A protein has these predicted regions:
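Low-complexity, acidic/polar, glycine-enriched regions of mature
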Residues: 29-199
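N-terminal secretory signal peptides
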Residues: 1-8, 15-22
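Short, cationic motifs built from Arg/Lys/His that form the positively charged side of catalytic pockets
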Residues: 10-11, 172
């Protein structure tokens, strides 16, 4: 099922859209709170196998809250919660394996959490969010590279949409997931993808 675009009031997104359109920035304003979940976006993970193949799965239940002042992206903050048992995967049996104690151990650790703040030097079009990632009872530093990827117009409705992404990488061994090291690589790519309707 395709995720529904997140409906955000036009006024709330004005400060985000204007820089993308090359227009003059508005005066500084208070940070806005944007909330979205699995009904409006996707949270994917990708692993490499046998140094040749890749596979991608999703978490079908998660929630995210982003605090963002478009005039000061360096003050952005994000909080994400993920239900680790909500894994969906195309390969038969993969979801059950990933929920097992060898991987996410979803029964014992049903939630993963990330809380990040923007690093200095970012722009509204691209900025890093860094902070602790808690997974399987282990907490490690983690960074998401957030981008406002592109603007487009929905040909069916005429609505203007901004596509946003946030990507990062973890070592699964750092969180205690050391099974099947000969078949599956240690580095796992994480990606959040969401579409914002602005008009």
């Amino acid at each position: 099922m395709q995720p529904k675009p997140l409906l955000i009031p036009r006024r709330a997104l004005a400060g985000v859209v204007l820089p993308l359109m090359g227009l003059a920035a508005r005066p500084a304003q208070a940070a806005r709170i944007f909330r979205f979940d699995h009904t409006q976006g996707r949270l994917e993970f990708t692993a490499r196998h046998l140094q040749v193949l890749t596979s991608t799965g999703q978490f079908s239940r998660f929630a995210c809250e982003l605090s963002l002042d478009p005039a000061r992206p360096e003050t952005a903050r994000v909080a994400v919660q993920v239900e680790t048992g909500s894994i969906a995967h195309a390969y038969p049996g993969a979801a059950d394996l990933l929920r097992s104690p060898a991987y996410f151990d979803a029964e014992r650790w049903p939630m993963a959490r990330f809380s990040g703040s923007a690093r200095p030097g970012g722009r509204i079009e691209a900025f890093d969010l860094a902070g602790p990632l808690e997974l399987r009872g282990v907490t490690q530093p983690f960074t998401l590279q957030a981008k406002l990827a592109r603007r487009r117009r929905d040909p069916a409705t005429g609505a203007e949409i901004v596509d946003c992404t946030a990507r990062g990488e973890i070592s699964r061994a750092a969180f205690g997931m050391t099974a099947d090291t000969l078949a599956t690589g240690d580095r796992v790519q994480l990606a959040v993808l969401v579409s914002l309707v602005i008009s």
